[in-house]
Amino acid sequence: MLDPVAESLGYEIVRLRLMGGTEQRRLQIMAEHPLLEDGSGGDMNVEDCAKLSRAVSEVLDAADPIAGEYTLEVSSPGIDRPLTRLKDFDDYAGLEARIELDRVAEGRKRFKGELAGVEDDQVGLNIEGEDDVTVYFPFAWVIDAKLVMTDALMERGAKQRAARLESDNEDLSESEED
C-alpha cells in the first residue's frame, strides 16, 4: 500500500515497523532514494522525510489500516543502516555487517564479516577472522542485519552525499534556467 506512494515520489521504503503496545504506538517508516550506478542516492534529508510523511499520511488516513492512535515517524535509515531487502546485501557488498539468523548455520546464529553479495536467494558473507571463508545462507533465515560503522562505510556515505548534493545542485540550476 505504501511502496507505490514512496516510489511515486522517488523513494524506496527500507523498513516499515509498528512499535509499542496498546499505548504510544509508533509507525516507523525508513526510506531512502534508490542507489544509482553513479553512487548517488541513498540517504534522505529532512525535506524528503517531510514530503514522504505528508503523502503517506494521506493514504493511511484514507485507508485507516491501523486501529487506534499512533504516531507516524519517517526517517532515513542512517549510515549504519539495517539490511532488510535482498538487494541491500548486493548494494552494500564489500562493507562490514552483523547478521543474525533464525537458526544455527556453521555452528552459530550470529555473524560479523564483509558482505559478499547475493547468489540466487543466498546472502554471502566473508567471515571475520577466518581466512578466505565465505558462507552463504538463505535470505529467509536472516532476522536482523545491519551495517557496521567503519571508515569504509563513512567514506562511502560521504561520496553518496557529495553525489547527491551535486545532483541537487544540477536540478536547481536547470530549474533556474527555466
From Swiss-Prot:
**One Pfam match, by short name?**
RimP_N
Gene Ontology biological-process annotations: ribosomal small subunit assembly; translation
Compartments where found: Cytoplasm
SUPFAM superfamilies for this protein? YhbC-like, C-terminal domain, YhbC-like, N-terminal domain
Q: Where is it mostly found? A: cytoplasm
Keyword tags: Cytoplasm, Ribosome biogenesis
Q: Where are the coiled-coil regions? A: none
Q: Origin, by domain of life?
A: Bacteria
Q: Record's Gene Ontology CC terms?
A: cytosol
| Record function comment | Required for maturation of 30S ribosomal subunits.
Q: Which family does it belong to?
A: Belongs to the RimP family.
Q: What is this protein called?
A: Ribosome maturation factor RimP
Protein source organism: Caulobacter vibrioides (strain ATCC 19089 / CIP 103742 / CB 15)
